[in-house]
Amino acid sequence: MENNNVISRNFDKPTIVTDDIKENCLLENTMIGGYGTAIIDRDFIQDMNKIAESIDTSNSNLIAIITDLQNKIYEYFYSKNGSSLSREKIYDEKAIVNEDGMVIGTKISDLKGMNVALCSEKSTSAYIILKNLYDNNKISRKPSLILSYLREEFSNDSNPHAFVTISKEDDLYPTKHLLYDIENPSMLEDDKKESFALVGVYALTDEEKEDIDNGYECTPTSLYEIISNYKEINAKRVYGSKDGKNNKKKKR
């Protein structure tokens, strides 16, 4: 298997992907708990492009588009009849080994319906779909795949995390970049104190987007708090730093 490129995780700065992801590109995951390298294989890319073709973009509502693609990504990776094995075990059993006996990684298409996909595979899926829609002029906002870090507010426990940022555009959400976290939904409460979950979409100012790109901490505001009367009730999420509170950005 020929490797065209590698999406590597950096310890001291985020990895930002804005170009097309090529067949057999390697996606590095954290090795904590046995998580290995994922292979972005042809079947997986074709599957994501098929999902992109099935997305209804006629009403130009980006939140509806993101909700639709998220539902389809979860249907792809999760199944009631899927495996009960651990992620580590499945990565081991499905591993691709080269002619020298070295493990290259595990095809993401082999994780279909296995109930073990995490943020890196799901965020890569979302990025490929959104990039397809953008390239075909079905959405006007350009996506980027980000490999960085995440922690909860008031916690120093920062872990590797993948998510998607979406460039700002003069549409329903003007002057705002967006951060889409497919792994973590937004828990919200309306003015009647009724709680519910929606896809995790956050608004970013220009400065916050710059912080994300440079690995500085950023605590974005839920988009729903800006465009509706909803209030986010889950713990605030802090993106973009590996060292938590000890890695605050310097004042400019």
Task: Identify the meaning behind each predicted range.
Residues 1-27:
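Intrinsically disordered, low-complexity N-terminal segments that are enriched in acidic
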Residues 1-9, 33, 237-252:
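Non-Sec secretion/translocation targeting segments of pathogen effectors
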Residues 32-109:
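Secondary-structure boundary elements
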Residues 39-69, 133-142, 164-170, 236-248:
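Gram-negative host-targeted secretion-system effectors, predominantly Type III and Type IV
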Residues 49-52, 70, 209, 227, ...:
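Residue-level detector of alpha-helical secondary structure
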Residues 65-69, 112-130:
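Active-site nucleophilic cysteine motif
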Residues 121-217:
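Hydrophobic/aromatic-rich core segments of domains that either
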Residues 212-241:
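Low-complexity, Gly/Ser/Thr/Pro-rich intrinsically disordered linker/tail segments
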